[in-house]
């Protein structure tokens, strides 16, 4: 559908019987109204043509071949001079055959049928609105017991209130035997309400605003009672309060969307367009049909049987009528959601029929596979790997993917710069991978964002915009901080990349969808760009260090000299036999890059004169004196060098290269943020 802002959208919800009839009914040029499917047949076995008023009827759903009716007559489509617009013999319109992809039909049900999604799916919408146990409603829908319908100011044959009690269940079986079908209908319409019709009557009598008011009053009363001290009673009250909240939210949703509660009970059953449930002829002349066709046939058979019982036969016991209504209800349940009530229906080969729910839900359903997961132009797909050197708003795009996605832009660039005379020459240069092609590709990519999407896209952060950069290999590089929004990890996950073409799409991507502009969760407002998985493991490895204490590697006098003054060339000496001293962090990282020390090797790093360390009353582990009078106080994680007059000359802390690298990254990030903030103010 298209709203008032001209946005295309898809809305799923309950609709009225009038709306279903409007979708499926069409008026032929001769004034005849068609749309109701009354026969369970598909194609005639001799002529291989659709049966009239059947599941593939050309009068209802349109011609199989464009402009050709069931009789074989042909008319030019769209020609105003051609008259008439339909065949007077078979009643088929001369229209495009693509109408069979969206033209619906309907089945007029002989009795109301409850929509199984609203009854059996948890939470049950019908049970919530009626405030009745689900088991009780199921017994009513499937004709296990009945409601008495007391009529005011009139004498009633049954003096009952509410439900038949279980000890007098025999009434349900004995009363219908005394009435013919017509008499039983009169009696039942006056005295007893059973089946989905009883549910529909109760839903139609509901006032949603009164439900909201009463539920809020009851919720407040339960809140005022407080805790009783009995754990079981407190849990019962808590469950009741949660139920009232769900009931209020459901009623508000119905009011907001202009949905009537009784629409959850079907009187008209929509029939899908035939192209969405096709019958295909395979090798050998055999036919392969969609399971939905067989389920529709089952519904029509049972519905026609019930119609015959209610209209033609006058001596059928009422119990048989109720049993047939139950069969119609079960057939519609199987069509909508096979197996929701227990054992699913199977065919002759013990294969479970694929119902409407199975067609649309799941990874291989209509939405995730056909609509959301369909292949589109200007898109690609590849495995994601971590790109630790990337900025948060950038992603690494393999050259092979980038040149395919931006090929048209590169061709335009080659022609504009007079490097190619036509499209063919430009494509030839791209196939040969000339250096100028990569230069133009870099220019094109600088100002063009791309969209990355990881299925399933459950919330808006499942698709975000990035500035692409060329990388080697065949995998898409991604910053690890954006993984939580995508719910992705680097164990083989795949992501799709899309190129926004229009200027509006590019502006929307830059203003709303860039990853550095989506740092908070839209659901709860908490930060979502936080270190997870690989980053946490990396931080742990970076800062774990050597777990050995200071006492394991005793103080070595050769450590007193600065590392820069060391003249030894044996790298293993620094790596395994001592803990070197460094005057600053740059020397320590330089030694690590020269592979003189390991990432987790303990070392001593000169530190600023920290007042907290100076004022500490901790007792040193060891004190070593030198010949010139200076001495070293060695503690668990730091070392103090004092002069002969006990003045502090230097302070060294015991750390690792990993800790130093993390500290420098944090310090640079804070300084960069401070500079950006000062520029902004």
UniProtKB/Swiss-Prot annotation:
Partners and quaternary state? In plastids the minimal PEP RNA polymerase catalytic core is composed of four subunits: alpha, beta, beta', and beta''. When a (nuclear-encoded) sigma factor is associated with the core the holoenzyme is formed, which can initiate transcription.
Q: Which family does it belong to?
A: Belongs to the RNA polymerase beta' chain family. RpoC1 subfamily.
Among the record's GO biological process terms, what is one?
DNA-templated transcription
A cellular component term from Gene Ontology for this protein is:
chloroplast
Q: What is this protein called?
A: DNA-directed RNA polymerase subunit beta'
Summarizing the function annotation, the protein's role is: DNA-dependent RNA polymerase catalyzes the transcription of DNA into RNA using the four ribonucleoside triphosphates as substrates.
Q: Where does Mg(2+) bind?
A: 489, 491, 493
Catalytic class of the enzyme: transferase
Sequence positions that bind Zn(2+):
69, 71, 87, 90
Which organism encodes this protein? Atropa belladonna (Belladonna)
Question: Where does this polypeptide localize?
Answer: Plastid, Chloroplast
Q: Per its record, what are the GO molecular function terms?
A: DNA binding; DNA-directed RNA polymerase activity; magnesium ion binding; zinc ion binding
Q: How is the cofactor bound?
A: Binds 1 Mg(2+) ion per subunit. Binds 1 Zn(2+) ion per subunit.
Q: Which reaction does it catalyse?
A: RNA(n) + a ribonucleoside 5'-triphosphate = RNA(n+1) + diphosphate
Source domain of life: Eukaryota
The cofactor(s) it depends on are:
Mg(2+); Zn(2+)
Enzyme Commission no: 2.7.7.6
The record ties this protein, via SMART domains, to:
RPOLA_N
Which UniProt key words apply to this protein? Chloroplast, DNA-directed RNA polymerase, Magnesium, Metal-binding, Nucleotidyltransferase, Plastid, Transcription, Transferase, Zinc
């Amino acid at each position: 559908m298209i709203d008032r802002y001209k946005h295309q959208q898809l809305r799923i919800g309950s609709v009225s019987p009038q709306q279903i009839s409007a979708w499926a009914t069409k008026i032929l040029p001769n004034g005849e109204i068609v749309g109701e499917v009354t026969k369970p047949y598909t194609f005639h076995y001799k002529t291989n043509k659709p049966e009239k008023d059947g599941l593939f009827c050309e009068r209802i759903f349109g011609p199989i071949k464009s402009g050709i009716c069931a009789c074989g007559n042909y008319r030019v489509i769209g020609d105003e001079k051609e008259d008439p617009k339909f065949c007077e013999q078979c009643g088929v319109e001369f229209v495009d055959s693509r109408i069979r992809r969206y033209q619906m039909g309907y089945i007029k049900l002989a009795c109301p049928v409850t929509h199984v999604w609203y009854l059996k799916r948890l939470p049950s919408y019908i049970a919530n609105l009626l405030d009745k146990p689900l088991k009780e409603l199921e017994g009513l829908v499937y004709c296990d017991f009945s409601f008495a319908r007391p009529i005011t100011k009139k004498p009633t044959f049954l003096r009952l209130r509410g439900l038949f009690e279980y000890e007098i269940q025999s009434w349900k079986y004995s009363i219908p035997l005394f009435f013919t079908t017509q008499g039983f209908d009169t009696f039942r319409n006056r005295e007893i309400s059973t089946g989905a019709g009883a549910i529909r009557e109760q839903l139609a009598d509901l006032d949603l605003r009164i439900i909201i008011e009463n539920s809020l009053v009851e919720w407040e009363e339960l809140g005022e009672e407080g805790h009783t001290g009995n754990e079981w009673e407190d849990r019962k009250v808590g469950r009741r309060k949660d139920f009232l909240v769900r009931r209020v939210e459901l009623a508000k949703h119905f009011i907001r969307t202009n949905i009537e509660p009784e629409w959850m009970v079907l009187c008209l059953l929509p029939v899908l367009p035939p192209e969405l449930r096709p019958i295909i002829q395979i090798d050998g002349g055999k036919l392969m049909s969609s399971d939905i066709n067989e389920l529709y046939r089952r519904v029509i058979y049972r519905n026609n049987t019930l119609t015959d019982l209610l209209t033609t036969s006058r001596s059928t016991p009422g119990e048989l009528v109720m049993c047939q209504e139950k069969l119609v209800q079960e057939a519609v349940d199987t069509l909508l959601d096979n197996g929701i009530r227990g054992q699913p229906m199977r065919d002759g080969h013990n294969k479970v029929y694929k119902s409407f729910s199975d067609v649309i839900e799941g990874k291989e359903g209509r939405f995730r596979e056909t609509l959301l997961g369909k292949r589109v132009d200007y898109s690609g797909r590849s495995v994601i790997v971590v790109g630790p050197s990337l900025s948060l708003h950038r992603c690494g795009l393999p050259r092979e993917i980038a040149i395919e996605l931006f090929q048209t832009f590169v061709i335009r660039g080659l022609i504009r710069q007079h490097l190619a005379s036509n499209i063919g020459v430009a494509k030839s240069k791209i196939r040969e991978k000339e250096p100028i092609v990569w230069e133009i590709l870099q220019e094109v990519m600088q100002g063009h964002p791309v969209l990355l999407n990881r299925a399933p896209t459950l919330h808006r952060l499942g698709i975000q915009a990035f500035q692409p950069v060329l990388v080697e290999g065949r995998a898409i590089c991604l910053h690890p901080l954006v993984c939580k929004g995508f719910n992705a990890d680097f164990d083989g996950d795949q992501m799709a990349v899309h190129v926004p073409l229009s200027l509006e799409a590019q502006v929307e991507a830059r203003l709303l969808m860039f990853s550095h502009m989506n740092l908070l969760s839209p659901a709860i407002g908490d930060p979502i760009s936080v270190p997870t998985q690989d980053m946490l493991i990396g931080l742990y490895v970076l800062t774990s260090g050597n777990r050995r204490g200071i006492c394991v590697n005793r103080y070595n006098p050769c450590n007193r000299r600065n590392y820069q003054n060391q003249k030894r060339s044996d790298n293993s000496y620094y790596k395994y036999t001592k803990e070197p001293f460094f005057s600053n962090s740059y020397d320590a990282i330089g030694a690590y890059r020269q592979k003189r020390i390991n990432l987790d090797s303990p070392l001593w790093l000169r530190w600023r004169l920290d007042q907290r360390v100076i004022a500490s009353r901790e007792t040193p582990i060891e004190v070593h004196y030198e010949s010139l009078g200076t001495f070293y106080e060695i503690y668990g994680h730091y070392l103090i060098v004092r002069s002969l007059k006990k003045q502090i000359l230097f302070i060294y802390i015991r750390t690792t290269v990993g800790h130093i690298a993390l500290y420098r990254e944090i310090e640079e990030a804070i300084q960069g943020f401070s500079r950006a903030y000062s520029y902004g103010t």
